Swiss-Prot record:
Claim: DNA damage is one of the keywords in the record: yes
One BP annotation, GO: DNA damage response
Main subcellular localisation: cytoplasm
UVR domain span: 204-239
Listed InterPro entries: DisA/LigA_HHH, GIY-YIG_endonuc, GIY-YIG_endonuc_sf, GIY-YIG_UvrC_Cho, RuvA_2-like, UVR_dom, UVR_dom_sf, UvrABC_protein_C
Protein keywords: Cytoplasm, DNA damage, DNA excision, DNA repair, Excision nuclease, SOS response
Record's protein name: UvrABC system protein C
Encoding gene, per UniProt annotation: uvrC
Role, per record: The UvrABC repair system catalyzes the recognition and processing of DNA lesions. UvrC both incises the 5' and 3' sides of the lesion. The N-terminal half is responsible for the 3' incision and the C-terminal half is responsible for the 5' incision.
A GO term, aspect molecular function: DNA binding
SUPFAM superfamilies: C-terminal UvrC-binding domain of UvrB (SSF46600), GIY-YIG endonuclease (SSF82771), RuvA domain 2-like (SSF47781)
Domain GIY-YIG: 13-92
Subcellular locations according to the entry: Cytoplasm
Family stated for the protein in its record: Belongs to the UvrC family.
Length: 618
């Protein structure tokens, strides 16, 4: 049993990281402290003016643990790593923890390539980015390939290597074939230098050079060459237009600001590379009404740069907490100097004001869309309540489905909709353990039993410990259950609920002969819902989502065994013959279509095994 009083008394006066846990042992908050003793005790002192969010967290703390570090910077590094690992409920978490794409020029190679990557390493390459839009990176690389004859293959080509036959790209003029030694390293590097100039925003020099060559070609009556150069000039100018110069310097900088409306906050980030905006991104954090902006920005930086592949030389913010400590952490991550600056006036300040305006517009648009959707979903839930004659609107809806292919790897899925919106954080997957073969009814009974058994256990644990109601994995029960099937599936669900003495309405979602949502079955009666357009769309969405989620899980489980359910069940087909069949025919469909003679052409196949394959797929 965790003795809170004893643990608080014995906290060390050293720097470190603390982890708050709920009654289920889940880590709900990770924080760092210069002095653990002082920081952790503050949470449990009634005299402290805690925010509503902190008060809610403290009510759910069942125990805590801590890790001592040698310094505050070590504590910060560990805190960021643990937040990334555990994704605690009460930490500020960015929903889009993504690595942005970069354009990479592989300068460490004798004959460099231009490729897309999401990982920045010190490998001698030159990186351009980040770009928020992955398709933009792809477009730029494709345009570069059309303009500059550089290689796209992954071969390890060195200048002194033995020449090999060039590929089709050489024949159509897209590559100078360094693999065949048709171009020297120094000449190839001149082309790469032009690519780097273009990506660095110095495209006007390249355009001028191309124009001179175009004019010479026209004077010499080489009109085809002149037209080709004209097209390349257009492509280069198109790439240049993709990035807008807003500063006269050519530093790599990020500008971060925020806008709060009293309840929620929108963070906006502008990425400037070589004086150009190469992208921007926003993040909306809910329920920040009682947190000051400097704390919000400090927490945002830890989360954002803890997951990004690139840290710029300078980061501009309107204000910040722990500035020196965060600078030290960023510099360690970057392995070169990174500075946080708060501009007071001038063009840097003007850009930050622009970033804040964008954050304000983004949050307002988000709220407007949210209100519009809320009104729509409110009407859907009201209509659903009336159609089914329920006592209350079904605020939380859970839908269940079973997926299997050829009777193997049966899996179950549960998707959740709250207030009309999908809630992926509450989705659950079940691998069927007790049922062999394709038996959807028994499989459904298993997953429903497990779902509500876990839920009741969690509720009992919460009540026994006299804690505030905690959102465990299964402890929140639905107001309505939707089954992807008819009366048989409904009866299974009701049987499970009755066994646990739980009273929840159960509905079946039925489809027509074209596999489109047709209506609902409730209390033994089929209800046609096509006259309720918004309800029809909502039920179709739920049905599609639960099916998609089940199928995606099934595919992930099959993995390398995706052919197991068929080939392994054919008599006289062992591991060797299975591999040979797949190697030669490439797919199950091709094996199904194979003739007797084609099967016998495989060295490991004999007459009997070929006949077995034909008989199996007959």
């Amino acid at each position: 049993m965790f003795d809170l009083e004893y643990q608080l008394k014995n906290l060390p006066d050293k720097p470190g990281v603390y982890l708050m846990k709920n009654n289920l042992g889940e880590i709900i908050y990770v924080g760092k402290a210069k002095i653990l003793k002082n920081r952790v005790r503050q949470y449990f002192q009634k005299s402290q003016k805690h925010s509503e969010k902190v008060k809610a967290m403290v009510k759910n703390i069942e125990e805590f643990e801590y890790i001592i570090t040698d310094s505050e910077i070590e504590a910060l590094i560990l805190e960021c790593n643990l937040i990334k690992k555990y994704r605690p409920k009460y930490n500020i978490l960015l929903k889009d923890d993504k690595h942005y794409p970069f354009i990479k020029v592989t300068l460490a190679e004798d004959f460099p390539r231009v490729i897309s990557t999401r990982k920045v390493t010190k490998d001698g390459s030159k990186y351009f980015g980040p770009y928020v839009d992955g398709s933009s990176v792809k477009d730029i690389i494709e345009l570069i390939k059309k303009t500059f004859p550089i290689r796209t293959c992954k071969k390890n080509i060195v200048e002194e290597a033995k020449a090999i036959r060039p590929c089709l790209n050489y024949q159509i003029g897209l590559c100078k074939a360094p693999c065949a030694q048709y171009i020297k390293k120094s000449e190839y590097r001149e082309t790469i230098d032009d690519v780097i100039k273009l990506l660095s925003g110095k495209h006007l020099d390249i355009v001028e050079n191309f124009k001179l060559n175009m004019e010479k070609a026209a004077e010499n009556l080489e009109f085809e060459k002149a037209a080709m150069l004209r097209d390349k000039i257009n492509i280069i100018e198109k790439i240049g237009e993709k990035q807008k110069i807003i500063l006269n310097n050519f530093d790599n900088e990020d500008y971060i600001s925020l806008y709060s409306d009293g309840k929620d906050t929108c963070f906006q980030v502008f990425f400037l590379r070589n004086g150009k905006i190469v992208g921007r991104e926003h993040f909306i954090i809910e329920d920040t009404f009682d947190t000051n902006s400097s704390t919000l920005i400090s927490n945002f930086l830890k989360e954002f740069y803890g997951g990004t592949a690139y840290i710029p030389k300078t980061i501009y913010v309107p204000n910040i907490e722990d500035e020196a400590l965060l600078e030290q952490w960023l510099t360690l991550k970057k392995e070169s100097k990174s500075t946080i600056k708060i501009p007071i006036k001038g063009e840097k300040k003007n850009i930050l004001v622009l970033v804040e305006k964008n954050a304000k517009t983004t949050l307002e648009n988000f709220k407007l869309k949210y209100l519009q959707e809320k009104a729509l979903y409110d009407n859907v839930l009201k209509d659903l309540k009336n159609i089914l004659r329920l006592q209350e609107e079904p605020i939380r809806i859970e839908a269940f489905d079973i997926s299997n292919i050829q009777g193997f790897d049966s899996v179950g899925s549960m998707v959740v909709f709250e207030k009309g919106r999908a809630k992926p954080s509450d989705y659950r997957r079940f691998k069927i353990n007790t049922v062999k073969g394709a038996d959807d009814y028994k499989s459904m009974k298993e997953i429903l039993t497990r779902r509500f058994q876990h839920g009741l256990s969690e509720i009992k644990s919460i009540q026994d410990r006299k804690l505030e109601f905690s959102s465990g994995k299964f402890s929140v029960f639905p107001d309505l259950i939707l089954m992807d099937g008819g009366k048989g599936q409904i009866n299974i669900a009701l049987e499970v609920l009755n066994a646990f003495n739980i009273d929840i309405p159960v509905c079946g979602m039925v489809k027509d002969n074209k596999h489109r949502t047709r209506g609902l079955i409730y209390n033994g009666e089929e209800i046609i819902i096509n006259k309720y357009g918004s309800v029809m769309k909502f039920i179709t969405r739920v049905q599609d989502e639960v099916h998609r989620f089940a199928i995606s899980y099934h595919r992930s489980l099959r993995g390398k065994n995706s052919f197991h359910s068929l080939l392994d069940d054919i008599p006289n087909i062992g591991e060797k013959r299975k591999k040979d069949l797949l190697f030669n025919f490439k797919s199950i469909d091709n094996i199904k279509k194979a003739t007797y003679e084609e099967l016998l052409s495989i060295p490991s196949m004999d007459k009997k095994s070929a006949e077995c394959v034909l008989e199996f797929f007959k």
